């Protein structure tokens, strides 16, 4: 994920990563990224239908979709996560978003601890729109405390299975570093963010000031979701974005 690629059909750059998502996206000059959040989680199939309608109503091609934020009922096993990802990616392929098995779409996928959806659902999505004289906009994919690569997530996770205050701090430090790495590759930093989100059921207060605020990650505040990363055994996830347009839609019914 060290080389920034271009996805011309969508008018954005991206950081190549794994087959189910990229590391982050940034709009081309002359375009910006718009985020649309569903008021309530929408089941995956219905969500894709809603996204198709919203994007087409905006006069944009489906290839303009550049990020998805998902909510799942509970953390997956490695095998279950792989099966879910294959189903999810199938729609992206139909929309012309996957080229030679390279996925340019950013993503986060987390599991609310309280009142989760019954099925995997959409929380929000992003797509590019034409824009004049706006600051560059971007979305960084969610990352937990496990490096991308081969082998199981448990083999790659920071202090896997540990939930002490010290372990959660170390996991957070790793994830913050990964956010900074992805931001830097796309030409951004914390000062460019307008939203930073944390996903964990563990207490962040012991390291909030010195690990998060002090490094500039909370300049626009923080949104803490009481949720788990999408894989069993992972405890801490973050994502971030720098956007001007952030809307809420009432299209589609809730996933309950």
Language-model-detected regions and their locations in the chain:
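Short, well-ordered alpha-helical segments
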Residues: 47-72, 77-87, 160-192
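C-terminal edge-of-domain segments
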Residues: 108-133, 219-256
């Amino acid at each position: 994920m060290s080389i920034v690629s271009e996805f011309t059909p969508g008018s954005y750059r991206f950081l190549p990563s794994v087959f189910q998502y990229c590391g982050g996206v940034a709009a081309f000059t002359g375009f910006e990224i718009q985020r649309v959040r569903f008021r309530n989680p929408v089941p995956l199939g219905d969500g894709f239908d809603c996204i198709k309608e919203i994007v087409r109503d905006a006069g944009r091609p489906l290839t303009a979709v550049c990020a998805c934020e998902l909510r799942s009922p509970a953390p997956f096993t490695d095998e279950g996560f792989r099966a879910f990802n294959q189903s999810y990616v199938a729609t992206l392929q139909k929309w012309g978003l996957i080229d030679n098995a390279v996925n340019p779409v950013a993503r986060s996928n987390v599991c609310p601890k309280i009142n989760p959806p019954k099925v995997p659902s959409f929380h929000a999505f992003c797509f590019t729109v034409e824009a004049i004289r706006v600051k560059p906009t971007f979305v960084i994919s969610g990352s937990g405390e496990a490096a991308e690569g081969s082998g199981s997530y448990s083999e790659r996770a920071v202090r896997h299975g540990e939930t002490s205050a010290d372990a959660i701090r170390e996991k957070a430090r790793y994830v913050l570093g990964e956010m900074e790495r992805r931001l830097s590759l796309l030409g951004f930093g914390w000062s460019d963010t307008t939203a930073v989100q944390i996903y964990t059921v563990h207490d962040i207060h012991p390291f909030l000031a010195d690990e998060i605020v002090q490094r500039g990650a909370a300049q626009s505040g923080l949104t803490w979701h009481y949720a788990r990363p999408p894989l069993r055994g992972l405890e801490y996830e973050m994502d971030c974005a720098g956007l001007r347009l952030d809307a809420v839609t009432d299209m589609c019914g809730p996933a309950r």
